[in-house]
C-alpha cells in the first residue's frame, strides 16, 4: 500500500523535467507512461525517490525496431509495445516522434456478426509467439477471435488499443491512392509524377505511378532496404523515417537517374506516394481521409495517421504509418474485399494493380555486398508484388489473394473470391522463437476455409 501511495504521489506531482534527468538507459519517459496508465507493478522508487521501471530490457541502440534475429524477453516486448504504439505521443526523446492525425469513428460503425469457434492450435500460437491478435473472417462472420493472454501482452492489448501497421501501411496508402484516382485528384495508375517540385532533379520525377506502386522505379543504386538495413546507401546513419521528403531528396537524390525497373522494396517509395496524394488533394486531404474511413471502412474507433513534427506541407511531411484497433483492421480489409467484389471504381483499381503485378525475382539473388541471399520473411514470401500488395502466395496457385504485410509478423490475407480474411497483429517474428506457423495460421484458412 505504501508503494502505491508513493507512486500515486509521484504520478500526480513530480514534474516531467525531473524524470527527464534520468540516464537514457533507464527510459524515464517509458517509466512515466507505465505510471500514467496504471502499470505500477513495473515501477519501483529508488533511494532518491525517483521512479524507475523494474523491467529487464535489452533494447537495440542502433535500431528503432526489434532486430529481426533477436528473441526478446517479455519485459523487452512490453517496452517495444510502448515504443511502437504510444511513444510518439509522449515526447520521448529516445525514440521516433511524429504528430498524430486523428480520424474520428464513423457515426454508424460496421457491426460484425460472430460465430466463434475454438481452435486450440491458434490459442497455443497466440500464447507462445509474438502475436497480439488473431482474427479469421469468413462469409460475413468472425469465426476466430483471439487476443494475447495476460501473461504475454494481454494486459496491454484490448479491443480499443490501436496497433501499428508497420509495412501494412504501404497497402493502406495504395488503397487511399485508389480513392484519389476515383475522386478525380489523379488520372490513373499510368499517370506520370511530373507536377510536384519536391521531386525535380531526382530519379523519382517523371515516374509512372504504376512503377512506384510496384516498387520498381529503378532506385536500387541509391536506396537499399533489406532486413535490418538502414536504407540510404550513401549514409547508413540517415533515417528517412523522421525526415520530410524535401530533405531526403535534397541530401541523397539530387541528379540521380533511374536504373533498370526491378522490384526494390523500400518504405521511401510509399512515403513519396503518400505525400503525392497530399499534394494532389491539397486542403481537402483530411476531409478526404475521413470520408474513406467513416463512409467506406466504417471504423469503430479513432484511426491514427502521423506526420513529421515540423516542416511545411509542401516539403512532404506525411508518414505512411497508421494505427487501427484490431477489429478496425478487419473492417479495413473487408472494405477492400467489398470494393473488389462489387466492382466499384476502387474495386476496378484493385483489379488493375493485380493485373499489373510484377515478379519479385528474388530466388537466388544476392543482397548488397554479395554475401547473403534475399530471403523475405515467410509470412510475405510471395512470387509477385503489385500496387503495394503481395500476391501469389505458395500453395494458393491461381487464387486472387491480396496480402498486406509488416515487420514483426503483421499480416492480412484477403481472399476476394471466397470472402475469407485473416488478420494477424504481431510484435515480433523471426526464424526461431517467434516464428509462428504461417501455413496453419495464414495459408490454410485462406485455402480451405472452415
Predicted regions and their residues:
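Active-site SXXK
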Residues: 140, 161-188, 212, 273-277, ...
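N-terminal leader/targeting segments and the immediately adjacent pre-domain N-terminus
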Residues: 20-155, 186, 214, 440-450
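Active-site helix/loop module of the DD-peptidase/beta-lactamase fold
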Residues: 182-220, 254, 281-320, 324, ...
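Active-site-proximal loop and beta-strand segments within enzyme catalytic domains
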Residues: 123-124, 155-160, 164-165, 169, ...
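Active-site-proximal alpha-helical segments within enzyme catalytic domains
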Residues: 269-276, 320-345, 410-427
